[in-house]
Amino acid sequence: MPSFDIVSEIDMQEVRNAVENATRDLANRWDFRNVPASFELNEKNESIKVVSESDFQVEQLLDILRAQLSKRGIEGAALEIPEEMARSGKTYSVDAKLKQGIESVQAKKLVKLIKDSKLKVQAQIQGEQVRVTGKARDDLQAVMALVRAADLGQPFQFNNFRD
């Protein structure tokens, strides 16, 4: 029976490249001249810290970062940005987390979405991924289209497609 896995993975090398490109963009921007602003990638915590003098500048830096991530093939939904900015002294900062893996709550929503579609497929949670099996390849492709169209707040990839 044909099957595939739904996963949520981020290539950390691409994230590193996007942060480096964003830092390069920051150096070229005239509105950030002589401003202590920076991007800091923490690969252990899978987060990116954005620091600047004002909250408006932090928002601009986040836009630069999102643009660079999308150029490198990483969706903006992969960043989990907190509502509040941390403030220490003269600087504002945001610690944006990178979403990897499918949490159990998200996986349950995904399985429910697939089962509610009434397609002849089975979906089961396997750790941080969801395996979808079905008799017809067309049904599996319909599930892929359904998951892409659904707004679950996290980017998903499909791999391990077996016939």
Curated annotation (Swiss-Prot):
Keyword annotations: Nucleotide-binding
Record's keyword annotation contains Nucleotide-binding: yes
GO function terms (MF aspect): nucleotide binding
Superkingdom per UniProt: Bacteria
Transmembrane region(s): none
InterPro entries assigned to the protein according to its UniProt record, in alphabetical order: DUF520, UPF0234-like_C, UPF0234_N, YajQ-like_sf
Family, per entry: Belongs to the YajQ family.
The protein, known as: Nucleotide-binding protein YPO3170
